[in-house]
Amino acid sequence: DGIRWLLLDSLEEVNKVPGILGTAQLDWVARELDSAPATPAVIFVHHNVEPVDMGLKDTKALLEVLRPRRQLKCIFFGHTHEWRRFAVDGIHMVNLPAIGYAFKKGEPVGWVRGTPRAAGLTLELRSLDGAHPDHGKKIELEWRANGEGGKRVGRF
C-alpha cells in the first residue's frame, strides 16, 4: 500500500546542460515497477522530460518504459525553474519551481507540498514570496487507472 517513490540520476556530465538516464537506469525502473504492479509510483528526476536541448536526451526511451506500466502516475522534474503541469498519456508531468531563483520574471520561487490521497496527490505551491498570486494554490492530481488507456495531453 501507499506510493512508491523512485529517484533517478539524470546527470550526464558536470557543467553540461542536458541530462540522460541511460539503459541501466531505464532497465532498473522497469524492474522496480514490474515488481509492484498494483502500487502507485512516482518518479523524481532533475532534468525536464521534454525532448529539448536542455532536457533529457532519452525522454522517448523513458516514455516507452513508462507508458505500459500503468502504476506509474507522475514524474516530478525541475531544471527549467518553472512551475507548471501537463500530462502525457495520463502520466502527470510536474515541473517543480526553482528553490533559489527564477529564470523568468513572475515565476514563483519556493517548494511544493505534496499530500497523498487514495486516488491521487494534492500539490500546494509554497512560494517564498507570500504575495505571489500562486502561493498557497492547490492542484489535485488524479491517478490514471491501472487498466485504462490514457489520452495524450501535452507536447510529446
Regions inferred by a protein language model and the residue ranges of each:
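Short strand-connecting beta-turns/loops that link adjacent beta-strands
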Residues: 2, 38, 117-119
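Formylglycine-dependent
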Residues: 2-3, 10-12
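His/acidic metal-ligating clusters that form di-metal
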Residues: 4-6, 16-92, 146-155
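A cross-family glycoside hydrolase active-site/sugar-binding cleft signature
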Residues: 9, 44-46, 96, 124
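Short histidine/acidic/glycine/proline-rich micro-motifs that form metal-
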Residues: 12, 48-52, 99-101
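Acidic/histidine-rich helix-loop elements
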Residues: 12-23, 102-106, 140
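Binuclear metal-dependent phosphoesterase catalytic core
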Residues: 84-156
